[in-house]
Design a protein with these regions (language model features):
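A general structural motif
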Residues: 1-3, 37, 99, 148
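Short, solvent-exposed loop/turn segments at secondary-structure boundaries
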Residues: 18-22, 76-79
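Hydrophobic, aromatic-enriched interface-forming segments
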Residues: 140-160
């Protein structure tokens, strides 16, 4: 029998998009597939620090995280790709030019551009979620040592952002 490999996303695949629950049936199926000699991986857009321990406790063989920027197998890091500071600064400059919201993510931290406040409702919701989890988001984006693994930009041409209207979006 040949070994097969399966990849599972977290959000909306392993867990319910409604309440984040993880069904026992999924845990049992993954463990049975491993017992049958197959490799089980998480493949998520989340960076490593955002993968909750409950997922790793299932017994996955490895994880591809950060949209492919970080790969672990057998408890060892095989690959990590990050964007250098100069690239982060170029992205930040372009995002600010179009007046969009951005979050930069890495294995260690999550940083939002707070220079103009967060206006997009989805970005604001994510910021509040990370804040409630007590993430340290205080590292200055412009610091010369700052790099990131990936970034997300929110730009909605349907929303007219003003400082007064942004408060009404929540």
């Amino acid at each position: 029998m040949s070994t097969k490999i399966a990849f599972f996303d977290i959000d909306g695949t392993l867990t319910s998009e409604v309440d984040g629950s993880l069904p026992d049936s999924a845990i049992l199926a993954i463990r049975q597939a491993r017992a049958n000699g197959n490799l089980m991986f998480i493949n998520t857009g989340r960076c490593y620090q955002n993968v909750e321990p409950r997922f790793m406790e299932i017994g996955f063989d490895g994880i591809v995280c950060g949209c492919g920027t970080n790969i672990y197998y057998g408890g060892k890091e095989l690959m990590h790709v990050h964007q250098p500071h100069e690239v982060v600064m170029e992205i930040l400059e372009q995002v600010r030019k179009v007046d969009a919201d951005v979050v930069f993510e890495s294995r260690e931290e999550v940083l939002f551009d707070l220079s103009r406040g967060i206006r997009n409702p989805a970005a604001k919701k994510l910021y509040e979620e990370f804040k409630s989890l007590h993430y340290d988001m205080s590292h200055p984006l412009e610091a010369e040592d700052y790099t990131c693994d990936k970034f997300v930009v929110w730009y909605d041409t349907c929303l007219l952002y003003t400082s007064d209207a942004a408060d009404d979006l929540t």
